[in-house]
């Protein structure tokens, strides 16, 4: 999620680059078959995924003594609980002999995924003396004495300031269910590789001209070669207008993006087109190690153009030059979160008449007596259940828009809980209760306006910013309709782009959501207000429910994939460090 690009963007072409934009097709035509958020999720979850690696160190205190002539010989096993309830073993510690207060040395590594609720289950065993010379990975757990179990969510550990969580062990053991089974402590540490970045200054010379009446408008797209599928885009530069010898601002590639310094990277130079069909100028394949050598040896790499007849690629006169290569460590998303930064959740629900009468099963707002969630409930639950772990008080502002309230007027930002003052509810369950209550007390009306709820969220973020609060706000808008106030919404989003705020939009139903794709800046352009102001950064992420691939990826996974990157773009552009951390 790296990206050294910073500063105000003066135009749509320049706004294509920056912190890891959503990927486009690797073909020259650059056509996209699915929503960008969903595409990005699938492509980044290939053989070499892009998440932070976390090392967990375990220790225990006051374990149960199951041995007669000595103390227990404990070993810990960690599992990840899957959605269907199955336990997937992630790793085991070593066995420590004759010790009821073990401090295991063997670390267990797990990949942190912000967009998922990762439930960890820990089992502690007393390993029988007969198996002390057997490798721990081959031990049959059914042959060992069970000492207790602990469960937590990985984000619970990562949000602690010292990244340490202590669990009370429970479970049915032979000594009885009510006996004190001791505690298990988990300490998490993000690997250095997750924070290491390569900062690179690129320029090109002698590029081929692809335009008739002017020079090309080139930018670079860098992709990682993946063995099992097409290359995965990981970074783009800004566009340089009308220039065949362009020089770009520095880009940052994180080690978690490129895997290792020897991993092949495809570097494409493309001519920007406003249609989104960017034309390939040339490409080259280099690893990070090779880019470093180009810089040290002051050499250049020639671009090639793919042969349409599958023959030899055409070598071009255009060259890629690396003017500067520096490796450094940056603070990660988890550094900020564990230091005390919070993500504050807000939600806005569409109460326009196009949703259909909530009393009929065909309505998008229908509350099924069987407990089956409608699309609005599903989006609230999935997004809220992830973000709630990053909010200490779990008090969430919840609004509705496009509904006729009890006073007979249509409101585009009414409190979902029905209160005249105070828009907060407690927990995700509180949002669900307030939503169901509002359906009974608010009449569906219209039109569909976003600007009011965006302004309310921006006001909250602005107040927090003025108080120097370490908070970042996430507004979830769930809608079924076509926007009536497109210009007003764009203006509100451009104003909000300066604030610690991201806007997640879920489209429900079968409406044409082309407008939402425009808000999501999927063509590489940042939003431009009615007065000509360009958004400081892209703060919108959109996904339609119907575009989720056969249930293989949830709404929350597609929506939240880029949120840590948006957060980092904000804090890094303002040179904000984790609480108590020195500048680096």
From Swiss-Prot:
<keyword id="KW-1003">Cell membrane</keyword>
<feature type="binding site">
    <location>
        <position position="67"/>
    </location>
    <ligand>
        <name>Ca(2+) 1</name>
    </ligand>
</feature>
<dbReference type="GO" id="GO:0005886">
    <property type="term" value="C:plasma membrane"/>
</dbReference>
<feature type="binding site">
    <location>
        <position position="126"/>
    </location>
    <ligand>
        <name>Ca(2+) 2</name>
    </ligand>
</feature>
<feature type="binding site">
    <location>
        <position position="126"/>
    </location>
    <ligand>
        <name>Ca(2+) 1</name>
    </ligand>
</feature>
<comment type="function">
    <text>Negative regulator of cell death and defense responses. Repress a number of R genes and may have effects in promoting growth and development. May function in membrane trafficking and in fusion of vesicles with plasma membrane.</text>
</comment>
<feature type="domain" description="C2 2">
    <location>
        <begin position="178"/>
        <end position="305"/>
    </location>
</feature>
<keyword id="KW-0106">Calcium</keyword>
<dbReference type="InterPro" id="IPR045052">
    <property type="entry name" value="Copine"/>
</dbReference>
<dbReference type="InterPro" id="IPR037768">
    <property type="entry name" value="C2B_Copine"/>
</dbReference>
<dbReference type="InterPro" id="IPR010734">
    <property type="entry name" value="Copine_C"/>
</dbReference>
<dbReference type="GO" id="GO:0090332">
    <property type="term" value="P:stomatal closure"/>
</dbReference>
<keyword id="KW-0449">Lipoprotein</keyword>
<feature type="binding site">
    <location>
        <position position="128"/>
    </location>
    <ligand>
        <name>Ca(2+) 1</name>
    </ligand>
</feature>
<feature type="region of interest" description="Disordered">
    <location>
        <begin position="1"/>
        <end position="23"/>
    </location>
</feature>
<feature type="domain" description="C2 1">
    <location>
        <begin position="34"/>
        <end position="167"/>
    </location>
</feature>
<feature type="domain" description="VWFA">
    <location>
        <begin position="344"/>
        <end position="563"/>
    </location>
</feature>
<feature type="binding site">
    <location>
        <position position="73"/>
    </location>
    <ligand>
        <name>Ca(2+) 1</name>
    </ligand>
</feature>
<keyword id="KW-0677">Repeat</keyword>
<dbReference type="Pfam" id="PF00168">
    <property type="entry name" value="C2"/>
</dbReference>
<keyword id="KW-0611">Plant defense</keyword>
<dbReference type="Pfam" id="PF07002">
    <property type="entry name" value="Copine"/>
</dbReference>
<feature type="binding site">
    <location>
        <position position="145"/>
    </location>
    <ligand>
        <name>Ca(2+) 2</name>
    </ligand>
</feature>
<dbReference type="InterPro" id="IPR036465">
    <property type="entry name" value="vWFA_dom_sf"/>
</dbReference>
<keyword id="KW-0479">Metal-binding</keyword>
<dbReference type="InterPro" id="IPR035892">
    <property type="entry name" value="C2_domain_sf"/>
</dbReference>
<dbReference type="GO" id="GO:0046872">
    <property type="term" value="F:metal ion binding"/>
</dbReference>
<keyword id="KW-0519">Myristate</keyword>
<feature type="binding site">
    <location>
        <position position="128"/>
    </location>
    <ligand>
        <name>Ca(2+) 2</name>
    </ligand>
</feature>
<feature type="binding site">
    <location>
        <position position="67"/>
    </location>
    <ligand>
        <name>Ca(2+) 2</name>
    </ligand>
</feature>
<comment type="subunit">
    <text>Interacts with BAP1 and BAP2.</text>
</comment>
<dbReference type="InterPro" id="IPR002035">
    <property type="entry name" value="VWF_A"/>
</dbReference>
<comment type="similarity">
    <text>Belongs to the copine family.</text>
</comment>
<dbReference type="GO" id="GO:0006952">
    <property type="term" value="P:defense response"/>
</dbReference>
<keyword id="KW-0472">Membrane</keyword>
<dbReference type="GO" id="GO:0005544">
    <property type="term" value="F:calcium-dependent phospholipid binding"/>
</dbReference>
<dbReference type="InterPro" id="IPR000008">
    <property type="entry name" value="C2_dom"/>
</dbReference>
<feature type="lipid moiety-binding region" description="N-myristoyl glycine">
    <location>
        <position position="2"/>
    </location>
</feature>
<protein>
    <recommendedName>
        <fullName>Protein BONZAI 3</fullName>
    </recommendedName>
</protein>
């Amino acid at each position: 999620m790296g990206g050294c690009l910073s500063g105000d963007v003066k135009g749509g072409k320049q706004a294509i680059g920056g912190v890891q934009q959503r990927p486009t097709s690797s073909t020259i035509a650059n056509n996209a078959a699915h929503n960008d958020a969903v595409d990005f999720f699938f492509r980044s979850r290939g053989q070499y995924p892009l998440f932070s690696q976390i090392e967990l160190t375990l220790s225990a205190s006051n374990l149960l003594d199951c041995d007669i002539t000595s103390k227990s010989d404990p070993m810990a096993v960690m599992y990840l609980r899957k959605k269907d309830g199955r336990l997937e073993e992630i790793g085991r510690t070593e066995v420590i002999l004759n010790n009821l207060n073990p401090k295991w040395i063997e670390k267990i590594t797990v990949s942190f995924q912000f967009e998922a609720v990762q439930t960890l289950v820990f089992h502690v065993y007393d390993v029988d003396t007969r198996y002390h010379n057997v490798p721990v990975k081959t031990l049959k757990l059914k042959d060992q004495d069970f000492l207790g179990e602990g469960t937590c969510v990985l984000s619970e550990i990562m949000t602690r300031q010292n990244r340490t969580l202590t669990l009370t062990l429970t479970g049915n053991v032979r000594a009885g269910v009510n006996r004190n089974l001791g505690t298990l402590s988990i300490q998490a540490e993000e690997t250095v590789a997750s924070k290491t970045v390569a900062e690179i200054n690129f320029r090109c010379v002698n590029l081929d001209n692809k335009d008739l009446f002017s020079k090309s408008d080139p930018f670079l797209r860098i992709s990682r070669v993946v063995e099992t599928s097409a290359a995965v885009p990981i970074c783009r530069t800004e566009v340089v207008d009308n220039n065949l010898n362009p020089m770009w601002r520095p880009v940052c590639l994180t080690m978690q993006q490129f895997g290792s310094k020897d991993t092949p990277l495809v570097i494409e130079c493309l001519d920007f087109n406003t249609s989104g069909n960017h034309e390939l100028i040339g490409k080259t394949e280099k690893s990070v190690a090779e880019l470093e050598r180009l810089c040290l040896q002051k050499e250049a790499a020639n671009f090639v153009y793919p042969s349409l007849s599958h023959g030899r690629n055409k070598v071009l006169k255009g060259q890629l030059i690396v003017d500067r290569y520096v490796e450094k460590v940056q603070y990660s998303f988890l550094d900020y979160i564990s230091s005390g930064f919070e993500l504050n959740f807000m939600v806005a629900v569409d109460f326009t008449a196009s949703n259909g009468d909530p009393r009929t099963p065909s309505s998008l707002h229908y509350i099924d007596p069987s407990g089956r969630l409608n699309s609005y409930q599903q989006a609230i639950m999935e997004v809220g259940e992830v973000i709630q772990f990053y909010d200490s008080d779990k008090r969430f502002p919840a609004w509705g828009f496009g509904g006729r309230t009890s006073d007979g007027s249509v409101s585009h930002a009414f409190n979902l809980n029905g209160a005249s003052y105070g828009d907060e509810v407690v927990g995700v369950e509180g949002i669900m209760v307030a939503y169901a209550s509002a359906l009974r007390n608010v009449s569906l009306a219209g039109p569909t306006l976003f600007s009011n709820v965006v302004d309310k969220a921006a006001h909250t973020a602005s107040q927090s910013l003025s108080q120097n609060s370490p908070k970042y706000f996430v507004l979830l808008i769930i809608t079924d309709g076509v926007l009536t106030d497109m210009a007003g919404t764009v203006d509100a989003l451009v104003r909000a782009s300066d604030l610690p705020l991201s806007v997640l939009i879920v489209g429900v139903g079968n409406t044409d959501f082309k407008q939402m794709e425009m808000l999501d800046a999927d063509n590489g352009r940042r939003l431009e207000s009615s007065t000509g102001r360009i958004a400081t950064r892209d703060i919108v992420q959109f996904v339609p429910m119907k575009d989720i691939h056969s249930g293989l990826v949830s709404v929350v996974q597609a929506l939240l994939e880029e949120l840590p990157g948006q957060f980092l773009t904000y804090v890094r552009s303002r040179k904000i460090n984790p609480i108590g951390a020195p500048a680096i």
